[in-house]
Amino acid sequence: MEALQNMVFALCEAAGTSGAESPAAAAAAGFLESAAQVEIDPMGNVVGRLGKIGAPNRILLNAHLDQISMMVTEIDADGFLRIAPCGGIDRRVLPGSPVTVLGRERLTGIVCGAVYGADKLPPLEEMAVDLGMTKEQAELLVSPGDRVVYSGRPQRLLGSRVTSPSLDDRAGCAAVIRAAQLLAGEDLSWEVIVLLSSREETGGPGAGTAAYVLDPAQAICVDVSFAVQPGLQKGKYASLGGGPMVGIAPALSSGMRADLTRIAKQEGIPYQLEVMGGSTGTDTDHICIARGGVACAMLSLPQRNMHTPAEIVDLQDLEWTARLMAAYVRGLV
């Protein structure tokens, strides 16, 4: 579990916002290259090949690289950085929060904004990042388009739980890489393609274009989903440490789901179900419609505090997810 934690922490500490994933891609490629032939495609996706490379049947193991962030839109006359969302930022946690501006160098700032009272939040366009600089000083280090991310470092909690910004979806990337490591060197019937995709938080073009080029027959997509916490009741949401959430949705293959749950029972891997009546809101929605269609399954990692600076996952869920994917791939003929 220590090696898995080290990988998760290293991935979370690498910047990788939508459309600017290069540092995170380099970190992920470094962990993957011992198990697969790795390249980074024109969209910034990390692609790793293993198993029976060149086989007519290919399975994609997917998670997304990018983290939610904000983008500098202008530097106002008083030196404040005006910002816009780059993905689904949770503005409830922003006022008074420290953030990191990825300018010509990494800068620490504080989000400030209009004060409406405890029962109302200012819209994001009324918030700004305070660097403690004048306009002239800020312009030497920051430009419109620079990204702003939550400050914070990964930390171990009790047991096998960890907290960090960007666990959505670096935790999923770690689970997919771990699955590749488990499969490395094995005599497999299918080609296995790891796809750590770009720009999921801003529409999913990374996964969509890669799935078209790679042309898999099947795909297993790993992302995070909501875990039980105050305000989210048991039964509708998953439990941390309860195993991966196997997805049920119109876009997903019922046959693959049945095989995954059967294999989980055989392997003694706990799992939970996640029922979605419409789209999944993940890269699965883009992969499943590539070319003539791709049979897709979805495994979600239970997570608390999604899209905040203190997301929480259980490393045991990541390990079980990796082992379930590896067992599924071994069974393909």
Name each model-derived stretch:
Residues 1-333:
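N-terminal hydrophobic/helix-forming segments and targeting peptides
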